[in-house]
Amino acid sequence: MVPKLFTSPICLLLLLGLMGVEGSLHAKPGQFTWAQWFEIQHINMTSGQCTNAMLVINNYQRRCKNQNTFLLTTFADVVHVCGNPSMPCPSNTSLNNCHHSGVQVPLIHCNLTTPSQNISNCKYTQTTANKFYIVACNNSDPVRDPPQYPVVPVHLDRVI
């Protein structure tokens, strides 16, 4: 007894569940703008150790994120990258709002090594490097983002 593809209620529920999981992996918490969420995820490394720093992000998302990269630079410096020439985004070439950093920055890449349902028990290893990065930038939220930044980073697209 094999369910018919896409007509079975079970297949439909599985498909919707997978779509929901994929959507939630990239969702930002509602209280933040995309720029604020970018800063939390990729600039504000609250601790020098990934396991502790990732706890901040994981608390907002209520799950252990598989990996994350922290750029050891300032938000203002990343905003400045948004002024570099636009290019297609490597992760989605139909988007043309990406910008290459032009200079390497120190960064820390965190990789989940011990997943857990309890986010306090998730453990990460970290790798340090100096690399270029590519960010996607959009117009800022005129009400909630700093007014001195009309264009802001919203997504770390690639580290190279």
From Swiss-Prot:
Positions of the catalytic residues: H42, H155
Residues glycosylated per entry: W34, N44, N92, N111, N118, N138
Assigned keywords, A-Z: Disulfide bond, Endonuclease, Glycoprotein, Hydrolase, Lyase, Lysosome, Nitration, Nuclease, Signal
SUPFAM superfamilies: RNase A-like (SSF54076)
Pfam families named in the record: RnaseA
Recorded superkingdom: Eukaryota
UniProt xrefs under Gene3D superfamilies: Ribonuclease A-like domain (3.10.130.10)
Secretion signal, residue range per the UniProt entry: 1-27
Catalysis: reaction(s): an [RNA] containing cytidine + H2O = an [RNA]-3'-cytidine-3'-phosphate + a 5'-hydroxy-ribonucleotide-3'-[RNA]; an [RNA] containing uridine + H2O = an [RNA]-3'-uridine-3'-phosphate + a 5'-hydroxy-ribonucleotide-3'-[RNA]
Any one cellular-component term (Gene Ontology): lysosome
Primary location: other
GO biological process, one term: innate immune response in mucosa
GO molecular-function term, one example from the UniProt record: lyase activity
Subcellular location(s) per record: Lysosome; Cytoplasmic granule
EC number: 4.6.1.18
Residues where substrate binds: K65, N66, Q67, N68, T69
Function: This is a non-secretory ribonuclease. It is a pyrimidine specific nuclease with a slight preference for U. Cytotoxin and helminthotoxin. Possesses a wide variety of biological activities.
Subunit structure: Interacts with and forms a tight 1:1 complex with RNH1. Dimerization of two such complexes may occur.
Family under the similarity heading: Belongs to the pancreatic ribonuclease family.
Name used for this protein in its record: Non-secretory ribonuclease
UniProt gene name: RNASE2
